[in-house]
Amino acid sequence: MICYPIIMNNQLKFSYKYPSLEPGILIKRYKRFLADIELKSGGIITAHCPNTGPMTGVSTPGSNVMVSYSNNPKRKLAYTWELIEVTDNEPTWVGINTALPNRVIKLALAENLFPELGDYYEVKTEVVYGKDRKSRVDFKLISETKNIYLEVKNTTWADGRVALFPDTVTKRGQKHLRELIGVVEQGERAVCLFLINRGDCYQFAPGDVADHDYGKLLREAMIKGVEILPCRFIVTPQEINYLGIAEFIN
């Protein structure tokens, strides 16, 4: 997968290209990591499902899906499930591969895509931090002023036009918020970036129904200075394009 930054009208248009994807129909997802899919080209395959969550609203049998293929002989499953088409509002592709957002954001950070982050001159990944030094933040942006600790969350669940996170109880996510609060208390900047992996949502809100404690903690973190960036992306079988910041609904 490749990132192509394109200059248009003096603005940076960020586009992340998928490899060639093959269409199919989802038969079922099971054991979290497996999905049976009927390929449009014929035949039924078992694909790797790179998403450990409940995938609320984005794992409906009979839905159109897209898969990638790998000829790596060391892989147990040659196909990986990448996208699903939902019809909550209008037909919309959703990226379900949870390994992808960090790769997308890493490339976006290299292109200084988000002016909200200000100036930084180095991007570090998987940096140890936190009260007990046992946590790792997705990105640390080195700045001449305050360094930025940035955590990325893949967001696929939606209620109408509102993207929601999380879609299940996440103790790990709660811990990340506490660690980010600690970063602010130490005088640095902390950012939680929600990558909205579908183009039909214009707003973002905490998924209180799924994890009330996370929603409460997220609001507390914002009050204490943790910055929230709910980033809208439109997804197609060819590419992912950045659309801007979604409105946060408290």
UniProtKB/Swiss-Prot annotation:
Molecular function in Gene Ontology: DNA binding
Family statement: Belongs to the SfsA family.
Protein name as it appears in the record: Sugar fermentation stimulation protein homolog
Taxonomic superkingdom: Bacteria
Source organism of this protein record: Trichodesmium erythraeum (strain IMS101)
Taxonomic path: Bacteria, Bacillati, Cyanobacteriota, Cyanophyceae, Oscillatoriophycideae
Pfam families with a match to the protein in the record: SfsA, SfsA_N
